[in-house]
């Protein structure tokens, strides 16, 4: 490990001169060293079968939306069920630091996710107030979550989660539509004081006697559910807990980090700046088909921390349909169709541009054009497909009308992504995972003109714009170290950051350390 650490230190110093002097990188080097050791010397628990896993073993088990995207392990990443009483599970099969009961009415767990990212100097013809900084930077983000749940009856569950999000993003999370770290809170003044993330009731209404087995987790206590059922959720949560899920690209703790990979960038879902909202969701599940509709509160202002409690005048309406079947090569796949409508106190890009051209202000100001009751709507196709050899293929295509301002998630009006995901069975590290994905983001012409005239969004604003699509490639490798400990290497390459051909490209490597308690 000493040699790995020295090698890693020398490599980073050569790639990023002066970085080691400016940044306390001991933690990062330790993570890198452990990952390298795990890759070079694959290890197995005593007694583990030395034969590689059968490549015909399915990678994904079809499950309902009974998981959480920020705490979840979706099917491909879900810890296996607890071993029978009196049986000691092999250490390679235990993916949490402490065991969790499969039968208790209580749920208590936690997680810690620490992300280190940096970039070197990159070319930029000019920079503005909201630009991604061309000078070298390094940052660390930290998210800690406590998950609590209780099963009141066989059909009623309650959840309470407390979270702390600290640290900062590169350039204070400005200058990129597809920002490099989903864990970053976009308002650095909020600090890391713990806050209530979720407070929610889940009610299950059986519609059939047949039952199906599902994974138990932080937002799903039952291990079996009626095959046909209604589910009603009410309270505080984040919309990606239940909408826009994807087995291969939705989890910033063990998978990708970019926030236009883990979610549809054009899905401007209702949320405050921390990503949470209050609302209600009604879901229907029937074997291979699911449908869900939700109504949630919108923030009072774009990227605001406070929600507008008047749901009659401001709200987000979301509808998603999904179907699971053996679509290709007799292997499981899922297709999801999503639509949304937001109603809020929004500004209009075309109106802001026209006011500027009429001499109102030195730059266009979208805030001055805000009017209550404006709409923004969009659609998405989301798919995942299991392939042979422990591979998975996934992608999203997102579209929003883009006339009114980006309000809650990020400044994207069109997005396309495609990626691959695999687990480490082939190299005898079945709990490791790796993936690569390409994303292209765009905005509508009026939005481009607004930024070109010097206007500021809540994320973007270079003072001028040479327009072009923002193109991102991200790759990662996550190594399972022991029980609930994971370490990851991540790299992202971004062309035309903030839709600006006059800036970039920029290369953003990163390290991630994750613990599941």
Predicted regions and their residues:
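N-terminal periplasmic/intermembrane-space "pro-region" immediately following the signal or transit peptide
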Residues: 43-137, 147, 151-153, 157, ...
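Short loop/turn motifs that connect adjacent beta-strands in outer-membrane beta-barrel proteins
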Residues: 96-108, 120-121, 150, 154-158, ...
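Residues that define the transmembrane beta-barrel architecture of outer-membrane proteins
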Residues: 104, 138-144, 192-197, 274-278, ...
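Transmembrane beta-barrel strands of outer-membrane/channel proteins
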Residues: 112-118, 160-164, 232-236, 293-297, ...
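Residue-level signature of outer-membrane beta-barrel architecture
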Residues: 114, 150-152, 162, 203-205, ...
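Surface-exposed coil loops of outer-membrane beta-barrel proteins
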Residues: 174-198, 208-320, 364-365, 455-465
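Outer-membrane beta-barrel "beta-signal"
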Residues: 197-210, 505-517
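Outer membrane beta-barrel transmembrane domains
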Residues: 322, 338, 342-373, 394, ...
